[in-house]
């Protein structure tokens, strides 16, 4: 079996406080993009993995291996699987590529191994693998996330804009981003849920500046090449541009795909780009 593992962008990301356990509470809107890894699953006696990107570990530290092991433990089985990851989504980019891979492994192996684990069990496994893994496991379109990013509300809608996503060849560690972002816990924030529902229903772009990303200012100060990408996007037709997650990837929303493609010409040729059509929803190709 073969499955696509799609990436995401964050449309707005508010860090609202720090928890006693050391994690931060946040609010964000997850939106899927048509940039994906492909995972091939083949029957085997043990769990193993190979990857087209030699920079990624394929040992027990890999999230795909961790996901398979977690399923084994939760179900009390010793089933095997041979996984091949065709890595296309940049890592260290704020696009959730590793989390999406892990969610895909959970979904596919729950089926292939005939475990039929309930939603709550899968959610508990997913959260331990990564805060945004539940989004990729249970949603296909836009979702509101609270808590540490694990409390989800599927909004049953999609963005009416083409999305140009840009990776400027910088890897920003999430740990670094949380240590260095400029704290604005006391700010009164707009309701992201209401904002994005209105945006998707009406296409009215006037509220787009309200979708701020709290990582952006610190990242831009430390990584000026990342800041420059946002400037290029806004100067070349983007209705809105922002950092995704903790970066370094950025995205621009465009009225149509033609304008998004035209904007690529303004970017350095070494930067990796992806265009997502309006109203995109995820379909991993498995029918699950």
Curated annotation (Swiss-Prot):
Task: Tell me yes or no: is Kinase among this UniProt entry's keywords.
Answer: yes
Catalytic site residues? 8, 132
> What EC number(s) does the entry state?
2.7.1.148
Q: Which GO terms describe its biological process?
A: isopentenyl diphosphate biosynthetic process, methylerythritol 4-phosphate pathway; terpenoid biosynthetic process
Catalytic reaction equation(s): 4-CDP-2-C-methyl-D-erythritol + ATP = 4-CDP-2-C-methyl-D-erythritol 2-phosphate + ADP + H(+)
What are the TM regions of this chain, as residue ranges? none
> Broadest EC class?
transferase
* Pathway(s) this gene product operates in, as recorded in its UniProt entry: Isoprenoid biosynthesis; isopentenyl diphosphate biosynthesis via DXP pathway; isopentenyl diphosphate from 1-deoxy-D-xylulose 5-phosphate: step 3/6
* Keywords, in A-Z order: ATP-binding, Isoprene biosynthesis, Kinase, Nucleotide-binding, Transferase
Question: Which InterPro entries does the record cross-reference, listed alphabetically?
Answer: GHMP_kinase_C_dom, GHMP_kinase_C_sf, GHMP_kinase_N_dom, IspE, Ribosomal_Su5_D2-typ_SF, Ribsml_uS5_D2-typ_fold_subgr
List of residues binding ATP? 90-100
GO-annotated molecular function: 4-(cytidine 5'-diphospho)-2-C-methyl-D-erythritol kinase activity; ATP binding
Q: Which HAMAP family match?
A: IspE
The UniProt similarity line reads: Belongs to the GHMP kinase family. IspE subfamily.
Function recorded in the entry: Catalyzes the phosphorylation of the position 2 hydroxy group of 4-diphosphocytidyl-2C-methyl-D-erythritol.
Know the name of this protein? 4-diphosphocytidyl-2-C-methyl-D-erythritol kinase
